């Protein structure tokens, strides 16, 4: 039996194409069936399956957590142990075992550092992405700026030998400068694009393993 394709209503050509892809996306359907808040949950599931980053008892900081797909995955892995601090300026419905902190990670750094003061983080994860500008290079540079912000928190709050997962968009020379700057900070750097990432997407995840100091 052939899978049914959902039809979309009348709208602009670009939004119609996006909506068509979205409603017929197998990961969107799977997320709905398995009660994940977003298809992005499967990206983290793939990342963790490959790299075994999050373990029971770990303390995890998630930056840019709304709507909560990644938070659900991490909370399931921790299973009532450790601690998950999920930070986003956008509203996010509560999840059992998750500390939801509403603030701007760029403009309210002092407040976040006060919140995590004295906390030894095992892992920092981020699925942050910039608003699309229409320029491949601009979007890539903006994504790297967000990743640099994630690394700012890692430098100050991630324990030695800790791990960072952060996303960038490929398409600018800044990527190579940024990644090269990390080689003195982490023992190993891996690039990973999950199957759950759309083929046309330029997103790639940097898996930064073994903070050196």
From Swiss-Prot:
Keyword Transit peptide belongs to the record: no
The protein's Enzyme Commission number: 2.1.1.166
InterPro entries: RNA_methyltr_RlmE, RNA_MeTrfase_FtsJ_dom, rRNA-MeTfrase_E, SAM-dependent_MTases_sf
Catalysed reactions, as listed in the record: uridine(2552) in 23S rRNA + S-adenosyl-L-methionine = 2'-O-methyluridine(2552) in 23S rRNA + S-adenosyl-L-homocysteine + H(+)
Keywords (A to Z) from UniProt: Cytoplasm, Methyltransferase, rRNA processing, S-adenosyl-L-methionine, Transferase
Intracellular or extracellular location(s): Cytoplasm
Primary location: cytoplasm
Family designation: Belongs to the class I-like SAM-binding methyltransferase superfamily. RNA methyltransferase RlmE family.
Chain's role: Specifically methylates the uridine in position 2552 of 23S rRNA at the 2'-O position of the ribose in the fully assembled 50S ribosomal subunit.
Name of the protein in its database record: Ribosomal RNA large subunit methyltransferase E
Originating organism: Neorickettsia sennetsu (strain ATCC VR-367 / Miyayama) (Ehrlichia sennetsu)
């Amino acid at each position: 039996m052939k899978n049914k394709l959902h039809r979309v209503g009348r709208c602009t050509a670009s939004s119609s194409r996006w909506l068509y892809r979205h409603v017929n996306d197998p990961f969107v359907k799977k997320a709905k069936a398995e009660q994940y808040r977003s298809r992005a949950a499967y990206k983290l599931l793939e990342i963790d399956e490959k790299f075994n980053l999050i373990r029971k008892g770990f303390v995890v900081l998630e930056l840019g957590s709304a709507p909560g797909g990644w938070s659900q995955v991490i909370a399931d892995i921790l299973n009532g142990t450790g601690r998950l601090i999920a930070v986003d300026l956008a509203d996010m419905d509560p999840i059992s075992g998750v500390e939801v902190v509403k603030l701007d990670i760029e403009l309210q750094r002092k407040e976040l550092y006060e919140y995590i003061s004295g906390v030894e983080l095992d892992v920092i994860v981020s699925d942050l992405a910039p608003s699309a500008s229409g320029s491949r290079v601009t979007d890539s540079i903006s994504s790297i700026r967000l990743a640099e912000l994630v690394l700012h928190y890692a430098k100050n709050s991630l324990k030695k030998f800790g791990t960072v997962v952060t996303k960038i968009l490929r398409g600018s020379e800044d990527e190579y400068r940024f990644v090269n700057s990390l080689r003195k900070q982490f023992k190993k750097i891996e690039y990973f694009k999950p199957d759950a990432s759309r083929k046309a997407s330029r997103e790639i995840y940097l898996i930064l393993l073994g903070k050196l100091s």
